[in-house]
Amino acid sequence: MGLTIAQKIIKEHLLKGEMTAGSEIALRIDQTLTQDATGTMAYLEFETMGIDRVRTERSVAYIDHNTLQSGFENADDHRFIQSIAKKHGIYFSRPGNGICHQVHLERFGIPGKTLIGSDSHTPTGGGIGMLAFGAGGLDVAVAMGGGAYYITMPKMIKVNLTGKLRPFVTAKDVSLEILRILSVKGGVGYIIEWGGEGIQSLSVPERATITNMGTELGATTSIFPSDDVTKAFLEAEGRGADWKPLASDPDAEYDRIIDIDLSTLEPLIAKPHSPDNIAKVSELKGTKVDQVCIGSCTNSSLYDMLKVAALLKGKTISPEVSLSISPGSKQVLAMLADCGALSDILASGARVLECACGPCIGMGFSPNSAGVSLRTFNRNFEGRSGTADGKVYLVSPETAVAAALTGYITDPTMLGEMPKVEVPKQFKIDDSAIITPASPEEAKDLEILRGPNIKKFPDAKPQEDELSAELVLKVGDNITTDHIMPAGAKILPYRSNIPYLSQFCFGVCDKTFPARAQEAGQSIIVGGANYGQGSSREHAALVPLYLGVRAVITKSFARIHIANLINAGIMPLTFQNPDDYEKIDQGDKLTIKNIYAGMESGAMTLIDETKGLEIPLACAFTDRQIAILKAGSLLAYTKEENA
């Protein structure tokens, strides 16, 4: 039997385990990336390992999230990251150089390599043929130290693309179509591999848009072949030597095959407040729009920006709409300036923002009260924009421009003929904003710079054989890490300060949670299906740990979050019968006995002391995960292993 693209890369990097779906495997990691909202914690964790220099082929620290410096906190954290990067062999991408995934694609991505990043949209690298995973910061820290990255061997979905996209229909619409087909839970446990003759018409940035939003499916990762299109992109970046061909075997087997004819697609839109709440743009025409944001790691490439500039050229945006443009990198911005496209954007009335994440994470440009905001981003979770009652829709750059010009949701095909856009065969290369690390000899004398906002992370709490605790919070389905640990301009600067962050934990769901959790001492959370979807932020585990949460019981978990819970020492459990979720209530006193035996057998019993009920629970821990929980955290376990 032949192998898929992903299976070939896994086989080449396999350190432990068997390539059997559902079993645990350990992978050698070639590259890592961090961003500053999660990176500070990752580097604090790396420091505690006592390793002088990273042991990956390439590790890069990006500053792209906390670029709004309204106080000392972000600037201090950036100095810390820059100093630790220089000392420990990590490349440092300065603020303003661009969004981590866009810059990594441009300057560091290599087909066939493995990459993990402390950002859930790291699978963007799949657009260039990398096996790229989003992970918690602790997993990234371990990988930087030369440790393996452990995952459950995924199943495989093949998406066959045929035909070509029509004018005004884009890669973003392909992403929204697969979300319509699979939903935000449909990719859990799968790697999604894209192929078929239709991919030949998709550039690397378009492919990266699609793999980027594979994260919204819950997929382990997504990947495209490495072909002549990939080669042309790398040559344009002056990195032709990094190219190698990569394709699935003709007799490769997949667990599911989905066929999409690109020529049949039309402009799509994701309505509030979920990326899979899909409709045709034409069905919502006439909806008044207050704000339009174009950019993010999903749609900020040179190709996207050139199309936006061409559509805006000679026109003026609606006086009722505020339009922001965030180029994905300094390279993109410089090339827009060189060819005159930036002038066309400015002349239209658009506001050009820094090359950073910005509005996507609620870092500025929040919509007005109850405002309708069309965004070319990847998530539209409630409150994520920074406006609690904001209504965020996800669209392509073309649909975004149509709304900016008309003031209403408008099918972009109504704009007339799509202007022809030519991407240069050679990109402008300027790596002056990427700081290379010091040599091992120079690094010995370098000091790590720490600001007062950097606090110690929570101590490990070894899992005991019995747990008695209050059910301090009960939540529903599709709880995101934005619900658990919100982002935004007011909170993100404190990502290195767990005690301060704790007062915002679950604030979207229940503002009384932090105080009640601390009063309880130790507690349990109960959730519905797909608990922990969204961002890879390990703070959604570390902050509940700090507040005394010892177990989370749900109908099901998102992949990255369940790993982060285990890494933090919080026990993730599921109901054997999902209907039992309805039987227990917030405030109930709960007990779980014989936990160690249950970890081994995969079954435990939850005793609801308040109601006199016994409820069967399930778990599926590997021997390694059991050892992590007993040690209290992945960090404590790693220290024990290296002692």
Predicted regions and their residues:
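Fe-S-dependent hydro-lyases/dehydratases of central metabolism
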Residues: 1-643
